[in-house]
């Protein structure tokens, strides 16, 4: 704990880029949540643009009040 699941449109990231992204996210969580490196997990879930509405409907819109960074768009 914590676990972060990054959802985004498909990107062609190399394994090196994925590793760097995970390291950066982990560093932020260690700094701000006082987590241990061994407690952090990071997932990268790539969602096709035509399937993003489902992410919005199930994960973003219902939790808008709890989001610590809200999107600058609506659906």
Swiss-Prot record:
It is found in: Cytoplasm. The keyword Nuclease does not apply. Its main location: cytoplasm. The lineage of its organism: Bacteria, Pseudomonadati, Pseudomonadota, Gammaproteobacteria, Enterobacterales. This is Tautomerase PptA. Gene3D superfamilies: Macrophage Migration Inhibitory Factor. It is an enzyme of class 5 (isomerase). HAMAP family: Tautomerase_PptA. Its EC number is 5.3.2.-. GO terms for cellular component: cytoplasm. Homodimer.
